[in-house]
Swiss-Prot record:
It comes from the Viruses. It comes from Rotavirus A (strain RVA/Cow/United States/B641/XXXX/G6P7[5]). Residues 1-50 form the signal peptide. Ca(2+) 2 binds at residues 177, 228-229, 231, 301. This is Outer capsid glycoprotein VP7. Its main location: virion. GO terms for cellular component: host cell endoplasmic reticulum lumen; T=13 icosahedral viral capsid; viral outer capsid. Some rotavirus strains are neuraminidase-sensitive and require sialic acid to attach to the cell surface. Some rotavirus strains are integrin-dependent. Some rotavirus strains depend on ganglioside for their entry into the host cell. Hsp70 also seems to be involved in the entry of some strains. InterPro entries: VP7 (IPR001963), VP7_1 (IPR042207), VP7_2 (IPR042210).
């Protein structure tokens, strides 16, 4: 009888020992698997980026997230505002402290010191070559000049909208525009653009494809050209490629963190390409021509109302890089 009890106790102790060994083995195996998994995740995390900017897509707009627009809960504490102005403004005011003065005035409207940036440009033509929009909100002041109406309207069309652009090889291929949103945008120090429409036999309509002198000239020595031709018709192009780059672009929609303020002029510029539609005036506004001090005072007074017509972007955007990126 005692032998049976001893055997039972021995079996019980042996079972407990085996169970303990098994549990420890399972624990070691699980620890190994978990640590190995975490090691792999840590290694991959150093290689991979959370946001993918390197897929080599020709996307030049829409790489940002629109935020719900509100100026009621003091979003300026985390927002930046860029104010672009011509050099003649600072020359006229002739005050080395004018930026500090305006910064203090913007503070009274809820914009903390350091959140407003003043960006100077030489003239409309120079600004057209490389319009860089760095801030969450961008206000571009353009003084009206009757001799530069076309340059102003094209610049406004460029920066107030997002464009998807691809390179064009005009030496090898013919091109056609598919719809009203499709435009050819040229930028450079000097852009002369000529076009020759083609028939179904790829023969020139009113021009010789072998002789650029017979092409129709649509732009001469300009810095920014937005070319619109008859949709659905192939064209042979001639462009001063040594000083100009041309891209085949599609208008994606409004760039809602940009507003253009026209200073002076009887009427606000119309950047609507379609003559049958109502002129586009949203985020395109006008201030009566005054001294530049009064212009800036007006901007400060109405800055919050202007921001209400805009939407903040998730990050700043370099318009030049956006245009040229492939």
């Amino acid at each position: 009888m005692y032998g049976i009890e001893y055997t039972t106790i021995l079996i019980f102790l042996t079972s407990i020992t085996l169970l303990n060994y098994t549990l420890k083995s399972i624990t070691r195996i699980m620890d190994y698997i978990i640590y190995r998994f975490l090691l792999i995740v840590a290694i991959l995390a150093t290689i991979m980026n959370a946001q993918n900017y390197g897929v080599n897509l020709p996307i030049t707009g829409s790489m940002d997230t629109a935020y719900a627009n509100s100026t009621q809960s003091e979003p300026f504490l985390t927002s930046t505002l860029c104010l672009y102005y011509p050099v003649e403004a600072s020359n006229e005011m002739a005050d080395t402290e004018w930026k500090d003065t305006l910064s203090q005035l913007f503070l009274t409207k809820g914009w903390p010191t350091g959140s407003v940036y003043f960006k100077e440009y030489t003239d409309i033509a120079a600004f057209s070559v490389e319009p860089q929009l760095y801030c969450d909100y961008n206000l571009v002041l353009m003084k009206y000049d009757s001799t530069q109406k076309l340059d102003m309207s094209e610049l406004a069309d460029l920066i107030l909208n997002e464009w998807l652009c691809n390179p064009m090889d005009i030496t090898l291929y013919y091109y056609q525009q598919t719809d009203e949103a499709n435009k050819w945008i040229s930028m450079g120090s000097s852009c002369t653009v000529k076009v020759c429409p083609l028939n179904t036999q790829t023969l020139g309509i009113g021009c010789l494809i072998t002789n650029p002198d017979t092409f129709e000239t649509v732009a001469t020595t300009e810095k920014l050209v937005i070319t619109d031709v008859v949709d659905g018709v192939n064209h042979k192009l001639n462009v001063t490629t040594a000083t100009c780059t041309i891209r085949n672009c599609k208008k994606l929609g409004p760039r809602e963190n940009v507003a253009v303020i026209q200073v002076g002029g009887a009427n606000i510029l119309d950047i609507t390409a379609d003559p049958t539609t109502t002129p586009q005036t949203e985020r395109m506004m006008r201030i009566n021509w005054k001294k530049w001090w009064q212009v800036f005072y007006t901007v400060v007074d109405y800055v919050n109302q202007i921001i209400q017509t805009m939407s903040k972007r998730s990050r700043s955007l370099n318009s030049s890089a956006f245009y040229y990126r492939v």
